[in-house]
Swiss-Prot record:
Lineage, highest ranks first: Viruses, Varidnaviria, Bamfordvirae, Nucleocytoviricota, Pokkesviricetes
Similarity remark: Belongs to the asfivirus DP238L family.
Domain of life (superkingdom): Viruses
Compositional bias ranges of the Acidic residues kind: 197-214
Expression induction: Expressed in the early phase of the viral replicative cycle.
Positions with biased composition (Polar residues): 80-93
The species this protein was found in: African swine fever virus (isolate Warthog/Namibia/Wart80/1980)
Region (Disordered) location: 60-96, 192-235
UniProt-recorded name of the protein: Uncharacterized protein DP238L
Keyword field: Early protein
Length: 235
C-alpha cells in the first residue's frame, strides 16, 4: 500500500491526455512566476479497473506504473489541500478549481466509483498584499506623516514667534517704565543732571550756612592764607 505523500513525490512527463491517469505532480505544468500547483488525486484502484485502463496495456512504457504502486487509500474528490499536506503554512489562502470537466462529469454521474482521477488546480495567494501596492501604501503613509510634521512645525513656529513677540513687547514695556521712572527722578531733583553756575553755588552756600558760621569760615580761610604766605616768606 502506497501512501499519498509518497505517491505525490513521483513526477511524470506526460499528463495531458485522458489515458495518462497517473498519480502525482507534473513538474512541467508548474508555472515559474506564480504559486500554483497542478496535482492529480487518485482514489483506490482495483486490479480489475487497472486492466481496463489504456495506460496499463502499455507494459513497455517507462512512464507506466505498477498496480501495487497505484493502489492507495480511498479519498473523496473534495479533499482539501491542507489535509493532504500538513506542512503547508496556514497563512496562505487555498483555492481549488476542477480543470478536467469530463472526469468531473464522469465522477459525478457515478457516485460510487472513486477510481477516476481528479485534477485540482491549487493557487496559493499570500495573505499580505503585493510588493508594489505595499510600497505605494508606505509612500502615502510617509507623505501623510511628513505633512503632519510640517503642520506641527508651522504651528510650533507660529506659537514660538507669538511667544517671542510677547516677550519683546513685555521687555519694551519694562524699558519704557524704567525710562518714566528716570524722568520722574530727574524732575524731582533737577540739580542731579544740570551743571551749577557760580551764582547758584553762592546762593546755595548762603542758604546753607548762617552768618556766624560764615564769619568763622572766613576767619579760618584768612588764617590759612596768612600761614601759606608765611611759609613762602620763610623760603
Amino acid at each position: 500500500m502506497a501512501h499519498g505523500r509518497n505517491i505525490r513525490k513521483r513526477t511524470f512527463s506526460v499528463m495531458d491526455t485522458l489515458s495518462d491517469k497517473n498519480i502525482g505532480i507534473h513538474t512541467n505544468s508548474l508555472p515559474k512566476n506564480i504559486l500554483c500547483r497542478r496535482i492529480l488525486f487518485k482514489g483506490k484502484i482495483s486490479k480489475y479497473s487497472i486492466f481496463n485502463d489504456n495506460l496499463a496495456k502499455d507494459h513497455s512504457s517507462n512512464r507506466s506504473m505498477s498496480i501495487d504502486s497505484l493502489t492507495g487509500k480511498k479519498r473523496p474528490h473534495d479533499i482539501s489541500f491542507q489535509n493532504m499536506n500538513s506542512s503547508m503554512p496556514s497563512s496562505t489562502q487555498k483555492k481549488t478549481k476542477i480543470l478536467d470537466e469530463e472526469i468531473k462529469d464522469q465522477s459525478s454521474s457515478n457516485e460510487n466509483d472513486r477510481d477516476s482521477p481528479v485534477i485540482v488546480d491549487i493557487t496559493l495567494k499570500p495573505s499580505y498584499m503585493p510588493k508594489t501596492s505595499r510600497i505605494t501604501e508606505i509612500i502615502h503613509k510617509m507623505k501623510e506623516l511628513n505633512m503632519n510634521r510640517i503642520e506641527d512645525g508651522l504651528s510650533f513656529n507660529k506659537k514660538r514667534s507669538e511667544h517671542d513677540a510677547k516677550n519683546v513687547l513685555l521687555h519694551t514695556m519694562e524699558m519704557e517704565e524704567d525710562c518714566e521712572i528716570e524722568e520722574d527722578i530727574a524732575i524731582d531733583s533737577p540739580y542731579l543732571n544740570t551743571s551749577l553756575s557760580e551764582d547758584d553755588t553762592e546762593s546755595i552756600v548762603e542758604t546753607d550756612y548762617s552768618e556766624e558760621e560764615k564769619e568763622s569760615i572766613s576767619e579760618t580761610e584768612s588764617s590759612s592764607d596768612d600761614e601759606s604766605y608765611s611759609l613762602y616768606d620763610s623760603f
